[in-house]
Amino acid sequence: MLYTHANIITVNPTRDILIDGAILVKDGSNTIDDIGKTDRLVSIYPNEKHKSLEGHIVMPGLISLHVHLAQSLLRSAADDLPLISWLCDTVWKMQGNFTQEDGYVASQLTIAEMLKSGTTTFVEALFAQRYGIEGAVKAVIESGIRGCIGKVVMDQPRYATQTGVSMHEGLIENSNSLNQAVESHSKFHGKGNGRVEIWFGARTPGGVSEELYRKMVKIARANNIGITMHCAEVKADREFFASKEHTPMTYCKDLGLLGPKTVLAHMVHLDTQDLEILEKHGNGTSVAHCPVSNSKLGSGIAPLKEMLEKSIIVGIGCDGCPCNNTMDLLQEMKMASLLPKALHGDPSIVPAEKIVEMATINGAKALGRDDLGSLEVGKKADFISLDLSNKLYAQPLRDLVSAVVYIATGADVATVVIDGKLIVEDHVLLTIDEPKLIDKAKKHGKKLQERAKVDVKGRWKEI
């Protein structure tokens, strides 16, 4: 297929933008076979089928570095609540009552939303055993998305230093969770033509003993298994590290967690020493920046400006539906740019170009994937198109990169191609029956809430 007449943000090493550009993906190929001006490619490949993307902005598929697949069924169930109440009274109670069918439907729902809003690759943070990892893998394979599924690794049920706070009994796992993660890796890693990866989803500091951390790291490094972990998300995390006579990054460094294919989510409460350790000893460690979640839960604002100044690899993640409400990474990208401008009183910092890099090429670096994140010959054919050509709110359309970050939302995504296959065409998801999924999500969400005995009410009276 020859995708023609697009304006292409390549994110290649010279950051070229091709006006009236085209991308060739040959029949049966999963890589970009050629890219350039439309006139040239049409003349060279006269027998290829054409799909016109005239007026569309084409860019690499978005990479979301921090996602909770199961939490889509918890959407809007815990808004405007303090963190501990949010966790104990709603989120953990509902997740602790999941069935494996809930896990499959929730995975489908999260993935469908990501696909329709331009995310082509994601990292799942901590998929619990009770959710049924087979269902998550099935959802990834069926949908066409790329997914790094972090199977939860834990042996402590508490939250940071909150000794009186424990997870719902339905979510508690022991050190055998590491063995289960290894088994899942052996069984599922590489499925779906390589689109499925199984990672270790270390819960949080405080949720994993030092002994289990060290075992996990040893196995991960020996087998090139990715690790993702919530880290320094809330002030209580900082208190936990202090109780161990550590800062967040001295703790991670001591345990051997820092290194390639380690994605640390949130990283809000860091000090100068932490940033210097990441800069000098990170060895490819990356950060999943989640500004919407951190804002909605009152966790704080991550030191994004400082991390980028030290060339730390920072990508972007949407987190989960109870703390974000959508999986629209384009909205997350806008927030990621705006927050540091307001915090530092400087509108020039973290510009649109840097944000696009975070959502594409930086995400690829975080995953250890040199075949993703930019549009170049030989790289995976993962790209999206946004149609702003006839939108009132986008006119007059000038700077394309700026438009992606400050104007576009997931609703503007018209085309999604992953692994060379057309997944979304003219805003229609081709791999999942949307009406059927919506119906299933409503039913499963209702039954789950009833089973968990969670009462969700707004503050205003419904009559």
From Swiss-Prot:
Keywords: Hydrolase, Metal-binding, Zinc. CDD domains: ATZ_TRZ_like. It comes from the Eukaryota. One of its GO terms (molecular function) is hydrolase activity, acting on carbon-nitrogen (but not peptide) bonds. One of its GO terms (cellular component) is cytosol. InterPro entries: Amidohydro-rel, Metal-dep_hydrolase_composite, Metal_Hydrolase, MTA/SAH_deaminase. Transmembrane segments: none annotated. Gene3D superfamilies: Metal-dependent hydrolases, Urease, subunit C, domain 1. Zn(2+) binds at H66, H68, H230, D319. Belongs to the metallo-dependent hydrolases superfamily. ATZ/TRZ family. This is Uncharacterized protein C1F8.04c.
